[in-house]
Amino acid sequence: MALSKEDILKWLEEAKTAEVVELITAIEEKFGVTAAAVAVAAGPGPAAGAEEQTEFDVMLVSFGDSKINVIKEVRAITGLGLGEAKALVEAVPKAVKEGVSKADAEEIKKKLEAVGAKVEIK
């Protein structure tokens, strides 16, 4: 007489833990399998496959109330002439520096924010 699925489930409900462990061990040996949980293959996470960003752009978003001081700081950072620095500041949002390291980008951001500018690092 073959056992039905219901018969097996009923036996498992009534069996002691030791009996279930013995059954699992016997099944593992008989069929060459393990009862270890199967890891589900998940898709890549949001950052998987993407390289860590090494170059950053410092974007001037707003010059705030101190346009002249921001122009002076942009000149010091970029080495641009007065007219070029003024045009850059007035063309916000605009990149002040592109392709710089994270440390340099943070330093530039700090300098510009100190004179009243609003800055983003991208």
From Swiss-Prot:
Matches recorded under SUPFAM superfamilies: ClpS-like, Ribosomal protein L7/12, oligomerisation (N-terminal) domain
GO molecular function (one): mRNA binding
InterPro entries (UniProt xref): Ribosomal_bL12, Ribosomal_bL12_C, Ribosomal_bL12_C/ClpS-like, Ribosomal_bL12_oligo, Ribosomal_bL12_oligo_N_sf
CDD domains: Ribosomal_L7_L12
Any one annotated GO CC term: cytosolic large ribosomal subunit
GO terms (BP aspect): translation
Keyword list, A-Z: Ribonucleoprotein, Ribosomal protein
Domain of life the protein comes from: Bacteria
Family in the record: Belongs to the bacterial ribosomal protein bL12 family.
Task of the protein: Forms part of the ribosomal stalk which helps the ribosome interact with GTP-bound translation factors. Is thus essential for accurate translation.
Assembly with partners or alone: Homodimer. Part of the ribosomal stalk of the 50S ribosomal subunit. Forms a multimeric L10(L12)X complex, where L10 forms an elongated spine to which 2 to 4 L12 dimers bind in a sequential fashion. Binds GTP-bound translation factors.
Name of the protein: Large ribosomal subunit protein bL12
